[in-house]
């Protein structure tokens, strides 16, 4: 198979597989249903906010409808209201809607982040985003001058979220050279406006025409392009949706392919409409001739958490210590994970189902102890999963409707009748979290999680990997305030021989420490357990349960901040250590790690991507050491270092999202994912997320031919807080299912990953310096075999006819290991490279079996040689009005006459006579 066919094959596989998304959105007869807009629990109660959300969506719907050629509109929206707000008659309990699967989050503005609407987008072009972020101030219309009408801004963000398009402006590079002329970064180029700069000194500001930087040929820093208020151009929404005439997305006919913006960089110069047209939404709809109705809204208020454990006690649970491991994990969940004031019930099943506990509200430690005593202790019989689910629904209905309740379903066995209760599950409104234990658990299990928005996890029989405890530890509430959720600090295991020691440390940072629990498990005999706090004081008092083979220590109050040390000693058995805690304060956001795969199914040879999002509130944590442990059904564990370098699988550098490709499949079936994150000497906190996908801040507008300026956009410059952040966390990334994996030896079908951060600079007037992050032999792993670099004076020829473009001599360029920085200096040959020339450059990496990567992002250099004589004044629309010659004669005692002549904008001639 040739490299081009291989790339197409991988692309097709990617399109066939559904991306992993928590969203409940469905497209039905051109209308989007199931949109969830959640109001953050920390937002003060304000009923007008609900009406403002309704107004925004209602205004956005017809704008979206017209912008997409009468194809899409907003049909119904659920607004999720915090539990702490007063209850009202028209507020109902949610079903599957949670904060976890919310498409839009309304949260208070941050001191550094401001009120800028933005969308989390960790994937590639065309991949759906994570969620839209809005603030109450924005919704209240207090940012109209800065971001434009709320409805239009929402459509801009919706395009990021739903179709994976990017912005067509550039806050860092607002102008570029094209054929020797300065152009504003915009789409389309038909948008006209003024180019001026607003200078402020002391308490006063004034507007002046922009001056040129004679070294670059571009405008000075601070220069802004302000669109005229009266326009005829209709595109583009991803550039300036606030302009009245803009009602469309850029198409291939009017798209500005040369503009250095994220849409061109990420989407291979394609217009936003081309990306939208390739979406599944577009493919399964046709334009409608009827005007859509206004959106409808449902008001949902979060209530108390209701959970029923549905636990397998069939005969197979007696093998491999599974039933005892279930007891250990179940005790952790009941003693530590489940939050106060929650309701918990318990059902077990074999060939039939049995109630172990009706719903009990967790108000004290004794309530927790009561439930732990109901965990199953004997295993026998067959496996009837539907019996367990039906009985769980009955248990819940005795006190509450099943809407919004949660079921934790654990099983290790096969059950070919499980699909018989799928309809009952769908109609219940309950969320089902599944835990598949061992290699024989029912293959239909994941369907229950998918159809209800629950978490799917897998635990192998490899006890030292602590998978079952990790699965139950991941079941903290998806709703409520983050300060009440359990946070896992450590999860570790080891098989010890001959009185060996398992030594280690756990960091308790200042953001956690409440309800801290150390849990130790073993497989045969109680080990020696030694634990010291950061001051060196030995901690005694572990509660030992020899029957369940576990011991735990609850630290009273707030655990001391610092490094806790432990030593565990045993012979011929496997030990595990788990440490959990909660936020130390309701007002100090804890550091959290959220991990996931990009898909819940993987088909060889399509790669998977593992993500870990590390935050303290809205602030990303940078430079942490992050590793993913991915375990297959064979028991083989692969360790991946996750990176936040903006290369390979990672979409953006220094945004707190760490990513890596996974390609080392070894078998078909389930894989579990666990992420470990450590913050030490290098880890730091960033005040805000660098904007990737958001509405453009409007620098000003034109009124009566004069620019009215907004305050300068709040800059996030040098915002990394230098104080190091020390912490330790572990996080379950759930599980995924692989198929199509051939028997060993597994063939090499993985090419190098695409280079996405190619940059080019001119050195002198003839040399070009390239920098990029090295790809690997298999995506972002290993070392590529060679690079192919090609250049062209036509950006489209380079994209569409790469193999026909002029090749650069790279004989001396030896690829480095993946994720290293590459630097290459060359002189363009056999091509005209003179003043005013625009040169475009792209790279392709090749591996040892001649598989080729996708062509890189296209870098651009424009050769500008400063003129010896003043250039002509550019046109007013594209730059500014001509500046008249000014001559000032001044005679001052003791000083010669000073003459100033402005020869051309940007050149100041001084002569002293």
From Swiss-Prot:
Enzyme Commission number: 3.4.-.-
Keywords linked to the UniProt accession: Autocatalytic cleavage, Calcium, Calcium transport, Chloride, Glycoprotein, Hydrolase, Ion transport, Metal-binding, Metalloprotease, Protease, Secreted, Signal, Transport, Zinc
Marked site (Cleavage) residue numbers: 694-695
UniProt xrefs under InterPro entries: CLCA_chordata (IPR004727), CLCA_N (IPR013642), CLCR (IPR051266), VWF_A (IPR002035), vWFA_dom_sf (IPR036465)
Gene Ontology biological process terms from the UniProt entry: calcium ion transport; proteolysis
Binding annotation for Zn(2+): 156, 160, 167
An MF annotation (GO) of this entry: intracellularly calcium-gated chloride channel activity
Domain of life of the organism encoding this protein: Eukaryota
UniProt-annotated location(s): Secreted, Extracellular space
The VWFA domain, residue ranges: 306-475
Stretch list, region Disordered: 866-885
PTM characteristics: Glycosylated.
NCBIfam families: choice_anch_X, hCaCC
Protein function: May be involved in mediating calcium-activated chloride conductance. May play critical roles in goblet cell metaplasia, mucus hypersecretion, cystic fibrosis and AHR. May be involved in the regulation of mucus production and/or secretion by goblet cells. Involved in the regulation of tissue inflammation in the innate immune response. May play a role as a tumor suppressor. Induces MUC5AC.
Domain text: The metalloprotease region is responsible for autoproteolytic processing. It can also cross-cleave other CLCA substrates.
Protein name: Calcium-activated chloride channel regulator 1
Organism: Macaca mulatta (Rhesus macaque)
Organismal lineage: Eukaryota, Metazoa, Chordata, Craniata, Vertebrata
Underlying gene: CLCA1
């Amino acid at each position: 198979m040739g490299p081009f066919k291989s790339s197409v094959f991988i692309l097709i596989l990617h399109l066939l597989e559904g991306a992993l998304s928590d969203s409940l959105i469905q497209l039905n007869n051109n209308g989007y249903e199931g949109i969830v807009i959640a109001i953050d629990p920390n937002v003060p109660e304000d009923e007008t906010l609900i009406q403002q959300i309704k107004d925004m969506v209602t205004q956005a719907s017809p704008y979206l409808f017209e912008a997409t050629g009468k194809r899409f509109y907003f049909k119904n929206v659920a607004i999720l209201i915090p539990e702490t707000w007063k209850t009202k008659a028209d507020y109902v309990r949610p079903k599957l809607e949670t904060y976890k699967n919310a498409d839009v989050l309304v949260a208070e503005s941050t001191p550094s982040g401001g009120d800028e609407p933005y969308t989390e987008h960790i994937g590639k072009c065309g991949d759906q985003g994570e969620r839209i972020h809005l603030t109450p101030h924005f919704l209240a219309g207090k940012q109209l001058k800065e971001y434009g009408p709320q409805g239009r801004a929402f459509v801009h963000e919706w395009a990021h979220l739903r179709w994976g398009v990017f912005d067509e402006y550039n806050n860092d590079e607002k102008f570029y050279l094209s054929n020797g002329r300065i152009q504003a970064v915009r789409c389309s180029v038909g948008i006209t406006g003024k180019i001026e700069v607003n200078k402020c000194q002391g308490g006063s500001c004034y507007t002046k025409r922009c001056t040129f930087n004679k070294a670059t040929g571009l405008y000075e820093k601070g220069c802004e392009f302000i669109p005229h208020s009266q326009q005829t151009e209709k595109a583009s929404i991803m550039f300036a949706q606030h302009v009245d005439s803009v009602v469309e997305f850029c198409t291939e006919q009017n798209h500005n392919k040369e503009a250095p913006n994220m849409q061109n960089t990420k989407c291979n110069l394609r217009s936003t409409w081309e990306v939208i047209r390739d979406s599944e939404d577009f493919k399964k709809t046709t334009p409608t001739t009827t005007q859509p109705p206004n959106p409808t809204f449902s008001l949902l208020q979060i209530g108390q958490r209701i959970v029923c454990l549905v636990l397998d006690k069939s005969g197979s649970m007696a093998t491999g210590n599974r039933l005892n491991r279930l007891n250990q994990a179940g005790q952790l969940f009941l003693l530590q994970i489940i939050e106060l004031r929650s309701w918990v019930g318990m059902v077990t099943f074999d060939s039939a189902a049995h109630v172990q506990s009706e719903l009990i509200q967790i108000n004290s430690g004794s309530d927790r102890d009561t439930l732990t005593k109901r965990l199953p202790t004997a295993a026998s019989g067959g496996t009837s999963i539907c019996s367990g689910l039906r009985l769980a629904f009955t248990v819940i209905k005795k006190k509450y409707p099943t809407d919004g309740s949660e079921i934790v379903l654990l099983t290790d066995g096969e059950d070919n009748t499980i699909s018989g209760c799928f309809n009952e599950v769908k109609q219940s409104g309950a969320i089902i979290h599944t835990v598949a234990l061992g290699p024989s658990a029912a293959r239909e299990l994941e369907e229950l999680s998918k159809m209800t928005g629950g978490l799917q996890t897998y635990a192998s029989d490899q006890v030292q990997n602590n998978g079952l405890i990790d699965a139950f530890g991941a079941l903290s509430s998806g709703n409520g305030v983050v300060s009440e959720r359990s946070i896992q600090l450590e999860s570790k295991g080891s098989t010890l021989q001959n009185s060996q020691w398992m030594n280690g440390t756990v960091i308790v940072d200042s953001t956690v420490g409440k309800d801290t629990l150390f849990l130790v498990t073993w497989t045969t005999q109680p080990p020696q357990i030694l634990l010291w706090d950061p001051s060196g004081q030995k901690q005694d008092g572990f509660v030992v349960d020899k029957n369940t083979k576990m011991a735990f220590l609850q630290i009273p109050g707030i655990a001391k901040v610092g490094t806790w040390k432990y030593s565990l000693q045993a012979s011929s058995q496997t030990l595990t250590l788990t440490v959990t805690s909660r936020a130390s304060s309701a007002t100090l956001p804890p550091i959290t790690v959220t991990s996931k795969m990009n898909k819940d199914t993987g088909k060889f040879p399509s790669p998977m991507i593992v993500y870990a999002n590390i935050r303290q509130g809205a602030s990303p944590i940078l430079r942490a050491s992050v590793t993913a442990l991915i375990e297959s059904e064979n028991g083989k564990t692969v360790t991946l270092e996750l990176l936040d370098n903006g290369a390979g699988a990672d979409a953006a550098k220094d945004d707190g999202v760490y990513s890596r490709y996974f390609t080392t499949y070894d078998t078909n079936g389930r894989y579990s994912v666990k992420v470990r994150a450590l913050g030490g000497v290098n880890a730091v906190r960033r005040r805000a997320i660098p904007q990737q996908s958001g509405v453009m801040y409007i620098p000003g507008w034109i009124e009566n031919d004069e620019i009215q300026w907004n305050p300068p956009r709040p800059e996030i410059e040098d915002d990394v807080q230098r104080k190091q952040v020390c912490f330790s966390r572990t996080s379950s990334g759930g599980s995924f299912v692989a198929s199509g994996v051939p028997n060993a030896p597994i063939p090499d079908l993985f090419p190098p990953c695409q280079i996405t951060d190619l940059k080019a600079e001119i050195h002198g007037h003839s040399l070009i310096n390239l920098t990029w992050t090295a790809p690997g032999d298999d995506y972002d792993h290993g070392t590529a075999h060679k690079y192919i670099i090609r250049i062209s004076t036509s950006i489209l020829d380079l994209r569409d006819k790469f193999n026909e473009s002029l090749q650069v001599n790279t004989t001396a360029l030896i690829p480095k290991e993946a994720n290293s920085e590459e630097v290459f200096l060359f002189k363009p040959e056999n091509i005209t490279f003179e003043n005013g020339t625009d040169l475009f450059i792209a790279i392709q990496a090749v591996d040892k079996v001649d598989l080729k990567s996708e062509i890189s992002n296209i870098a651009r250099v424009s050769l500008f040689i400063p003129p010896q004589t003043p250039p002509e004044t550019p046109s007013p629309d594209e730059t500014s009005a001509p500046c008249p010659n000014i001559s000032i004669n001044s005679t001052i005692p003791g000083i010669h006459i000073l003459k100033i002549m402005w020869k051309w904008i940007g050149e100041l001639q001084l002569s002293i006579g």
